[in-house]
């Protein structure tokens, strides 16, 4: 949090964003005040890819819940039976650097990988591109969202789309504003 006095005294010359999204920065106001704004695309790609795969495995295997119940003295083995991700269908919304990394690892686990990105014409072998984002929700058991937040992607994930899914599994949400709660 930057205080109002710091903003108004002209001391800020540069705002650096560790990551891609700059939707939380008023670029117009920064430009008017002569403040340079930059982001760091690619700097944390591998970390986000690994975290996304970690969330995918943790959610399908109920790792966090199992940890909590075990710490509370319960052994809930039967209630927390997870499933393997191999053979499941992963839908990637957005197919840039992060999603491509997720696709490569998910494929190595035996997942069937599908992607939607209106700006991508070709996908690597083993990834099926779709022209309609609703197809991803209809067909895939797990969804991972990896696109910049803008007016076209705000509230992209909503009740209607989630209700299309054969099973529920949302992962890799880079920004919660993609989801309508």
Where are these regions (language model features)?
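ADP-ribose/adenylate-binding Rossmann-like module
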Residues: 11-26, 163-181
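Hydrophobic residues in well-ordered beta-strands that form the structural core
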Residues: 24, 37-39, 115, 131, ...
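Phosphate-binding beta-alpha-beta segment of Rossmann-like dinucleotide-binding domains, i.e.
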Residues: 33, 41-89, 101-105
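Rossmann-like dinucleotide/phosphate-binding beta-alpha-beta segment
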Residues: 78-166
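An N-terminal-biased, well-structured beta-alpha scaffold segment characteristic
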Residues: 1-38, 138, 158
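Short, acidic/turn-prone active-site loops that include or flank metal/cofactor-
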Residues: 18-22, 42-45, 119, 136
């Amino acid at each position: 949090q930057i205080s109002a006095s710091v903003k108004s005294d002209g001391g800020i010359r540069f705002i650096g964003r560790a990551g891609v999204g700059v939707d939380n920065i008023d670029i117009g106001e920064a430009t008017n005040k002569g403040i340079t704004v930059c982001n760091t695309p690619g700097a944390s790609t591998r970390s986000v890819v690994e975290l996304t795969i970690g969330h995918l495995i943790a959610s399908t295997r109920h790792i966090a819940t199992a940890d909590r119940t075990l710490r509370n003295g319960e052994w809930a083995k039967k209630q927390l039976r997870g499933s393997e991700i191999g053979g499941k269908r992963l839908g990637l919304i957005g197919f840039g650097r992060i999603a491509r990394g997720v696709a490569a690892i998910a494929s190595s686990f035996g997942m069937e990988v599908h992607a939607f990105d209106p700006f991508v014409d070709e996908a690597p072998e083993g990834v099926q591109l779709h022209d309609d984002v609703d197809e991803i929700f209809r067909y895939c058991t797990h969804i991972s969202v990896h696109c910049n937040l803008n007016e076209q992607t705000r509230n992209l994930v909503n009740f209607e789309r989630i209700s299309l899914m054969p099973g529920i599994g949302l992962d890799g949400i880079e920004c919660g504003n993609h989801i309508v709660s």
